[in-house]
């Protein structure tokens, strides 16, 4: 017989749902892995582990990458680093600068000429 406790089911469809949610909500500064875990009623550790296993990178990375993708566009259009940071969900310009350094090895000012 089946065990009475409900096993957390995190299948590909759920991962894609979460990825879509991040793509739609990345500009919310409150968005983080805990918020997502709670929304899908999953434990933080389980969600993090399963997301990384399925997607090849962490859920927090997914959030940062979505923000940086939009930041590239805004910076290319002439937005300041401060304006861009606020529009893509970072509370401070330096958080955007840190994310660029971490994920792309450059600072936003190095992108201006590209």
What are these regions (language model features)?
Residues 1-17, 40, 53-65:
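Short, Lys/Arg-enriched, Trp-marked, Pro/Gly-tolerant hinge/linker segments that flank
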Residues 1-5, 17-31, 51-55, 72-80, ...:
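Basic, amphipathic alpha-helical hairpins
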Residues 34-62, 86-107:
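Basic/polar phosphate-binding segments, predominantly the helix-turn-helix DNA-binding elements
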Residues 53-91, 113-114:
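Terminal helix-turn-helix DNA-binding modules in bacterial transcription factors
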């Amino acid at each position: 017989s089946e065990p009475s406790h409900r096993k957390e089911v995190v299948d590909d469809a759920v991962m894609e749902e979460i990825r879509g949610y991040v793509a739609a909500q990345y500009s919310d500064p409150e968005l983080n892995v805990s918020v997502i875990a709670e929304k899908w009623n999953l434990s933080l550790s389980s969600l993090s582990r399963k997301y990384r296993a399925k997607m090849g990178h962490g859920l927090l990375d997914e959030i940062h990458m979505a923000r940086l993708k939009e930041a590239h566009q805004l910076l290319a259009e002439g937005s300041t680093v401060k304006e861009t940071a606020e529009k893509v969900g970072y509370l401070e310009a330096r958080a955007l600068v840190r994310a660029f350094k971490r994920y792309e090895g450059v600072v936003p000012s190095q992108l201006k000429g590209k």
